[in-house]
Amino acid sequence: MRSTFIIFGGIGVARERDLWRNGCIDWNDLPESGISMSPRLRREVEEAENAFKNMDAVYFASRLRPAERWRLLFDFENSCAFVDIEMDGYGKYANPAVVGICRNNSYSYLLKGKDLNRQNIADKLGDSKILVFYNGARHDLRFLKRLFPDIGDRYAAVDLLPIANQLGLKGGLKKIERELCIKRSRIVELSVSGRAVQLWKSWTRTGRRAFLNMLTLYNSEDTCNLYPISMKLRDMMRSGYMEGY
């Protein structure tokens, strides 16, 4: 984060690269960079210093466009929770049925009608500071807010979709996985792909554990694969910026 200058007013990506070329690679270097240290800029740098000291990911996310939030994945890598949800139906009236959370390489899930509520989501997220999704802004986060209305105030959100798009990678999660050579169980993919809602309905109708097991196994791969995807996208973005630099 400390090499990021686009969080300050009046500094865009091109100006940021100029600063890097001139040896300005930390906020502390700004006074010697030749840039005008206006009262506003001094105030913003002080705010950023305080936010960094407090590891305030929400502050930094608020200062970055969604496609630039890959920068958070360096200093906050160990404070990320990777989240994916399965729905109980289709359309705007559907609700989360399974919420999968992967933290510290450990997967867990919450089920509608059993333990899926605000308090349990917060407990599972623990001391996480960042929630990482794929297409989360339009899907996961929007539906999670029905259960956890202030989730966007408590955690920063990193949506990998706009980051992938900026790299020229288009499509859904499975397509991005293939592009990045991230593998998942072929049996699970063939068994579940496009049938998650059907599996949920079969589970609630019959109570047969096999349906739930397959659904949560599918969700675990969706959820846990977000970590290697995020790291690859992060490093690709950094390499692209360094080449420009």
Task: List the predicted regions and their residue ranges.
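Short, flexible loop/turn motifs enriched in small residues
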Residues: 91-97
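Conserved DEDDh/DEDDy metal-dependent 3′-5′ exonuclease domain
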Residues: 98-193
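Acidic, Mg2+-coordinating catalytic module of metal-dependent nucleases/exonucleases
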Residues: 181-245
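Two-metal-ion RNase H-like nuclease active-site motif
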Residues: 78-88, 219
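Short catalytic/ligand-binding loop motif for oxyanion handling, primarily in non-cytosolic enzymes
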Residues: 90-91, 140-143, 227
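N-terminal accessory regions of nucleic-acid-interacting proteins
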Residues: 1-77
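Catalytic micro-motifs at enzyme active sites that drive phosphoryl/nucleotidyl and oxygen chemistry
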Residues: 68-72, 86-90, 119-121
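Acidic active-site catalytic centers that drive phospho-/nucleotidyl reactions
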Residues: 84-86, 140, 159, 222
